[in-house]
UniProtKB/Swiss-Prot annotation:
Gene3D superfamilies: Winged helix-like DNA-binding domain superfamily/Winged helix DNA-binding domain. InterPro entries: DUF433 (IPR007367), Homeodomain-like_sf (IPR009057), WH-like_DNA-bd_sf (IPR036388). It comes from Mycobacterium tuberculosis (strain CDC 1551 / Oshkosh). This is Uncharacterized protein MT2366.
Amino acid sequence: MRADMSVTSMLDREVYVYAEVDKLIGLPAGTAKRWINGYERGGKDHPPILRVTPGATPWVTWGEFVETRMLAEYRDRRKVPIVRQRAAIEELRARFNLRYPLAHLRPFLSTHERDLTMGGEEIGLPDAEVTIRTGQALLGDARWLASIATPGRDEVGEAVIVELPVDKAFPEIVINPSPYSGQPTFVGRRVSPVTIAQMVDGGEEREDLAADYGLSLKQIQDAIDYTKKYRLARLVAA
C-alpha cells in the first residue's frame, strides 16, 4: 500500500452518477443503481444491497463507488445470491458500526488471521451459516483490491480506501475522487489513459507521448487496451 493520505469525509463525497459507475466498473447498464439504490419490478420493491434505504439523489458517493467495485468482484467470481450478499453486508455494517463497511480497511484487517463467522439466523438465513474468510468469502476475490488500494484516514481516524486500481490487468491506472473529478489516471500522473489512447488514435507517436507525459511504452499500450476494454472511447489504433 502507498503512504496514508489525509482525507475529510471523502467517503461521503458525491462524485458520480449511476451511469458513470456502470461504465467505469464495467457493469451492465442499470446495475449500479439497482445495487446502490434498489429497484421496483412487477410491483415489488427490492431493497438496496449497499444503501440502508433508497435515496432520491442521482449522485453516488465515493464510499458507494468503492463498495460497488468490491461487490462487482464478489458477485462475478463467487455467484453468491443477491439476498445473501445484502444480508451479509447489513451484518458487516452493524458489526463494525460503519456506513460503508466495504470501503473501510477495518473489516479486512479484522479477519486477516481468523474467520469472522455469522450464524445464518443473524442474516436471515436460518438453514445456513455464513463464514467470511480472509481473501475468499469476505469479498470473493476482492481482497486484492483492499491489499493494494491507497489508504487514507477519515475525519475520525478510520482507515478508508481513497484510491483504487481500475482493473487487475492495469494496476498502474487508478481512480481517485480528487484528480480529474474521479476519472481514471495513471499512478502519480495527472493524465487520463483515455486521453492518451485518443491521441494515439489521432496519429500521435507512442514514443513522443511517452516522453512528453513521463510514461513507459507499456503504459501507453495499457491506456489503449484499458480504453477499449471499458469502451471509454472509439478507437481504431491497435
